[in-house]
């Protein structure tokens, strides 16, 4: 059944279905303008870099945390123990930003340095621990329907299958598995990683994804604020198309003009 309501994650409602990352921008100004143009409400921050990002500035001080909901992530963690420790630190940083009730964490456990693929076993282990500690866990995973269902069953707030490897810009490479995850999930499905252009963001939403998380496609564009706006439009268009319902594909043509009662 199609959900026409707002995006609901961990008991909190969001109007925007586009989450945006804060890494890789050439300047703080580019980042701030991009966040604004994207109309996002949720922004991810790497806990290990929040006090010294690529621009050398403190994100806690540069971002208006009354406007954006912080999604701390455990980027850089290679096992479950590290991820749990960084998640706890991230929750404290959210409190320092004024978000006392924020228990969100984007769970990333990535020992693979070349392709940055997430470790399914360590992700599951960390998720179980963090859920018991009261976190709303948003796990970054491969497009694995069985793992996605298992994470849902233990209480994760969303599942976040990758479209393709982080920062690769290859788009959605495993449409079949992503479709199975979307069809089977009873929690929001957020496509994370690999989206490079607005059409790919739209494609994810047309499939029925509940949202997308994008960083590199915006931050590394020639004009990040403009790309943020374009991707925002793509997400909205894809969502509307999904709700509207596309025509069925068929192997033959059907005339769009009536064939009967034609006056000459």
Swiss-Prot record:
List the catalytic residues.
Answer: 106 (schiff-base intermediate with dxp)
- SUPFAM superfamilies assigned to the protein according to its UniProt record, in alphabetical order: ThiG-like
Catalysed reaction equations from the record:
[ThiS sulfur-carrier protein]-C-terminal-Gly-aminoethanethioate + 2-iminoacetate + 1-deoxy-D-xylulose 5-phosphate = [ThiS sulfur-carrier protein]-C-terminal Gly-Gly + 2-[(2R,5Z)-2-carboxy-4-methylthiazol-5(2H)-ylidene]ethyl phosphate + 2 H2O + H(+)
Does the record carry Transferase as a key word? yes
| Keyword terms of this UniProt record | Cytoplasm, Schiff base, Thiamine biosynthesis, Transferase
GO BP field: thiamine diphosphate biosynthetic process
Molecular function per GO = thiazole synthase activity
Residues recorded as binding 1-deoxy-D-xylulose 5-phosphate, renumbered to this chain, are 167, 193-194, 215-216
What EC number(s) is this enzyme filed under? 2.8.1.10
Which compartments does it reside in?
Cytoplasm
Query: Which pathway, per its entry?
Result: Cofactor biosynthesis; thiamine diphosphate biosynthesis
- Cellular component terms, GO, for this chain's entry? cytoplasm
- What CDD domains does the database record attribute to this sequence? ThiG (cd04728)
Q: Does the keyword Transferase apply?
A: yes
Pfam annotation, one family: ThiG
Q: Which domain of life is it from?
A: Bacteria
Similarity-based family? Belongs to the ThiG family.
Subunit text: Homotetramer. Forms heterodimers with either ThiH or ThiS.
Please describe what this protein does: Catalyzes the rearrangement of 1-deoxy-D-xylulose 5-phosphate (DXP) to produce the thiazole phosphate moiety of thiamine. Sulfur is provided by the thiocarboxylate moiety of the carrier protein ThiS. In vitro, sulfur can be provided by H(2)S.
Report what the protein is called: Thiazole synthase
Instruction: Give the organism, scientific name.
Output: Prochlorococcus marinus (strain MIT 9215)
Q: What is the lineage of its organism?
A: Bacteria, Bacillati, Cyanobacteriota, Cyanophyceae, Synechococcales
């Amino acid at each position: 059944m199609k959900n026409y309501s707002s995006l609901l994650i961990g008991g909190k409602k969001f109007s925007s279905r586009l989450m945006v990352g804060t890494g890789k921008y050439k300047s703080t100004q580019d980042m701030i303008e991009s966040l604004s143009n994207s109309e996002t409400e949720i922004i991810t921050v790497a806990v290990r870099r929040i006090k010294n990002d690529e621009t050398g500035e403190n994100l806690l001080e540069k971002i208006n945390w009354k406007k954006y909901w912080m999604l701390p992530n455990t980027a850089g963690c290679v096992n479950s123990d590290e991820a749990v420790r960084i998640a706890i630190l991230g929750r404290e940083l959210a409190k320092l930003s004024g978000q006392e009730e924020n228990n969100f964490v984007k769970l990333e456990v990535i020992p693979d340095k070349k392709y940055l693929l997430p470790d399914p076993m360590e992700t599951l282990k960390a998720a179980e621990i963090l859920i018991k500690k009261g976190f709303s866990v948003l796990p970054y995973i491969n497009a694995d329907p069985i793992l996605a269902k298992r994470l849902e069953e233990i209480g994760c707030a969303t599942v976040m299958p990758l479209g393709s490897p982080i920062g690769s810009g290859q788009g959605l490479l495993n449409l079949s598995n992503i479709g199975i995850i979307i069809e089977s999930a009873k929690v929001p499905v957020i496509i994370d990683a690999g989206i490079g252009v607005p059409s790919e963001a739209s494609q994810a939403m047309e499939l029925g994804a509940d949202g997308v998380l994008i960083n590199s496609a915006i931050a590394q564009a020639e004009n990040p604020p403009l790309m943020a706006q374009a991707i925002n439009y793509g997400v909205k268009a894809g969502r509307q198309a999904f709700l509207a319902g596309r025509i069925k594909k068929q192997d033959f043509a059907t005339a769009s003009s009536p064939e009967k009662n034609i006056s000459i």
